[in-house]
Amino acid sequence: MATPQQPLLTKTHKQNSIISFKILTFVVTLFVALFLVVFLVAPYQFEIKHSNLCKTAQDSQLCLSYVSDLMSNEIVTTDSDGLSILMKFLVNYVHQMNNAIPVVSKMKNQINDIRQEGALTDCLELLDQSVDLVSDSIAAIDKRTHSEHANAQSWLSGVLTNHVTCLDELDSFTKAMINGTNLDELISRAKVALAMLASVTTPNDDVLRPGLGKMPSWVSSRDRKLMESSGKDIGANAVVAKDGTGKYRTLAEAVAAAPDKSKTRYVIYVKRGIYKENVEVSSRKMKLMIVGDGMHATIITGNLNVVDGSTTFHSATLAAVGKGFILQDICIQNTAGPAKHQAVALRVGADKSVINRCRIDAYQDTLYAHSQRQFYRDSYVTGTIDFIFGNAAVVFQKCKLVARKPGKYQQNMVTAQGRTDPNQATGTSIQFCNIIASSDLEPVLKEFPTYLGRPWKKYSRTVVMESYLGGLINPAGWAEWDGDFALKTLYYGEFMNNGPGAGTSKRVKWPGYHCITDPAEAMPFTVAKLIQGGSWLRSTGVAYVDGLYD
């Protein structure tokens, strides 16, 4: 039998148990609430806080999901600013590309088809370049200046172009091959990186002054002399001559012997003659200048083409990727002819490159202005279909663009610009140029219509301004690529042109076509704005105008 105290003691023990249980429940509830705040509410607040970071993305939800992934992996925090998030995103992007390289290399080694092997070789080269470009972009963004922001936008635009080029090369092959390269993911990340960069503002530390079309006084005496001198008087580091009077007999040998990642200008002088070879200036060959005895005297010639098994990318007689490349007083040609379809004479993917007083001859796809910032001056470019194409930020000044007689039933297209995203800082600008017919086309103009361009990609962007347009230009001015593809998203413009082909009354009525009357609308396509020429062309010594004549 229980004593009188026992019920009281039992009741007290139960009360203590209840109190303990309530405390435990409260603590558990508190931890659950904290968990929800940290892992559910915080990311939501983070997403709201950084929604502006994705405001220009084509797929804003995908962009935000990438940002959320960075937070969930504790790579960034809710306090991280936009630039810090972008840099972490790019570091992760480099890892993804490095992971893709051995996969693509293994695919290439397992393939016996020469065309597929060639396409994968191109992809490997482009992936390797892209890793460097993204790494350079991270360093540029970290400096947080307007000029470095522009550099990063150019380089990241090039990365997206590289991925799309790889996709284009593989497009005719199996879907499994494309999936194996992880290209779709890499392209998505490149677009998101550009969108993030576009949303971040930086202080404007550049003051771009209008140029006067002459060499600036601040150019070093050596660089000015290089641009003004003839080849034989230039004081070259290496000389190429077919007759053995130079150190090298081929340009390819001289380029291979040039120093890697040079900090100063390295000059190769190529004596007059016809050199049958294909030459590549790799990304390691920086600040390289190749100069000849004149566009009619020193000729580099090749005939690689798509019909005979080459890729468009690797059909180039001369390809240049190394930053700061200069080509002067030389003819580059591809003699494959119109029946061989795509056959590139010159491909340029070198940032801050200059082509001065050169002749570039071929038929279809003559000049592949592939990517990065480029400037062409006093040069002569001939071709038929899409004879200036690619996705560089490129300005032509005082050049002659000459349409040739194409193959039967073909039409001439001066340009085919390949911008794939509105955040890419790319486009083709033709200023102070003459667009004319060759002597063999002139008698048969009615048989072979010539257009200023057609949209190769969705956001194609080309402006022709302050130029002479010959009577070869069809009154419509511009041609379709495939039905209504890109007609609403492209940007084609004409400003202050003259000549029999310059009338705009019968031009296309597409939403993306602009007959520009306000100089302010034309300014983004000048040397100063499109390629930021005021900050780098001055150091090359080439003559240029960085604004509009008016």
UniProtKB/Swiss-Prot annotation:
TM helices/strands, residue ranges: none
Active-site positions on this chain: 365 (proton donor), 386 (nucleophile)
Keyword Cell wall biogenesis/degradation: yes
Key words of the record: Aspartyl esterase, Cell wall, Cell wall biogenesis/degradation, Disulfide bond, Fruit ripening, Glycoprotein, Hydrolase, Secreted, Signal, Zymogen
A Pfam short name: Pectinesterase
Metabolic or biological pathway: Glycan metabolism; pectin degradation; 2-dehydro-3-deoxy-D-gluconate from pectin: step 1/5
InterPro entries in the record: Invertase/methylesterase_inhib, Pectin_lyas_fold, Pectin_lyase_fold/virulence, Pectinesterase_Asp_AS, Pectinesterase_cat, Pectinesterase_inhib_dom, Pectinesterase_Tyr_AS
Superkingdom of the source species: Eukaryota
Reactions this protein catalyses: [(1->4)-alpha-D-galacturonosyl methyl ester](n) + n H2O = [(1->4)-alpha-D-galacturonosyl](n) + n methanol + n H(+)
GO biological process: cell wall modification; fruit ripening; pectin catabolic process
PROSITE patterns: PECTINESTERASE_1, PECTINESTERASE_2
EC number: 3.1.1.11
Residues holding substrate: 312, 342, 454, 456
Misc. comment: The PMEI region may act as an autoinhibitory domain and prevent untimely PME activity during transport.
Family: In the N-terminal section; belongs to the PMEI family. In the C-terminal section; belongs to the pectinesterase family.
Function noted in UniProt: Pectinesterase may play a role in cell wall metabolism during fruit growth and development prior to ripening and may be required for preparing cell walls for softening by polygalacturonase during fruit ripening.
Protein name: Pectinesterase 2.2
Organism expressing this protein natively: Solanum lycopersicum
